[in-house]
Amino acid sequence: MSIIIRVEDLRAVYLVREGTIKAADGISLDILENSVTAIVGESASGKSTIIEAMTKTLPPNGRILSGRVLYKGKDLLTMREEELRKIRWKEIALVPQAAQQSLNPTMKVIEHFKDTVEAHGVRWSHSELIEKASEKLRMVRLNPEAVLNSYPLQLSGGMKQRVLIALALLLDPVVLILDEPTSALDVLTQAHIIQLLKELKKMLKITLIFVTHDIAVAAELADKVAVIYGGNLVEYNSTFQIFKNPLHPYTRGLINSIMAVNADMSKVKPIPGDPPSLLNPPSGCRFHPRCEYAMEICKKEKPKWIRLDGEAHVACHLYEEGRPLK
């Protein structure tokens, strides 16, 4: 598979009263065409910042300090807004986090579709809009006749999430980015959304990128996994290899903390300690205060991003020292 998006040394921060939050600190990542890539990490690890920076949709206090995001050889970060508007939704679409808050409660669903079309300079007649919107709603297993004239408050959380996905698909993008698509949903609805995304991927042959704090969701849906910790990318590999042979101590900790329905509680091992403050992150490797394998060098120097066999990449001093995780 060829590379459809290349992220190079992406650094993004938030300016707050207390100081500067270093939310994405030197992220480099290749997204392969027609792949499903999960960006996984704990809450407040910088996952959402990465995709917001990639799409230049950071909030007003967000700043991109450096880096490149290459799409078809062009850097999205240096494009003017009018250039970006030609790409957003038509080629790269973003489904925001929190379906409950992402739809305007005073507007019917059909009005959201109309606004999306107008915002991106597409000229459709009313009948064309209804036809296209209905087609996308059916794709996400919603009844257009029932949904188009409904207000968001008349829809369940799962229905709102599917409406957002339908809106994102309206202009037939080739890349679909989803921020926590299963958060704030009950377990059954989560399963339905995951299955829906699998079907859409197969049907439309698009590239999916999604953010999640739940590595079990990544196991269900993704074929590539990028693991984020404290604003740093610490591991990237195929999903199969991530679960078969996790390279980074943090990745292993995430996997060991998964609790199955029939889990032996004595074998479930939560990661000790708390995630770092990105206002004042630890020196060296940001995971070292919680890592059972930490060495003196981990406290002083940030580990290099190393490519190992095949697709495997890891940022860990164990591999620089020739002492891989066992």
Curated annotation (Swiss-Prot):
SUPFAM superfamilies in the cross-refs: P-loop containing nucleoside triphosphate hydrolases (SSF52540)
Lineage top rank: taxon: Bacteria
Enzymatic class: translocase
GO CC list: plasma membrane
InterPro entries, per database record: AAA+_ATPase (IPR003593), ABC_transporter-like_ATP-bd (IPR003439), ABC_transporter-like_CS (IPR017871), Oligopep_ABC_C (IPR013563), P-loop_NTPase (IPR027417)
Binding site for ATP: 44-49, 61, 97
Cellular localization per UniProt: Cell membrane
Keyword Transcription: no
Keywords: 4Fe-4S, ATP-binding, Cell membrane, Iron, Iron-sulfur, Membrane, Metal-binding, Nucleotide-binding, Peptide transport, Protein transport, Translocase, Transport
Family named by the database record: Belongs to the ABC transporter superfamily.
Protein name: Dipeptide transport ATP-binding protein DppD
Source species of the chain: Caldanaerobacter subterraneus subsp. tengcongensis (strain DSM 15242 / JCM 11007 / NBRC 100824 / MB4) (Thermoanaerobacter tengcongensis)
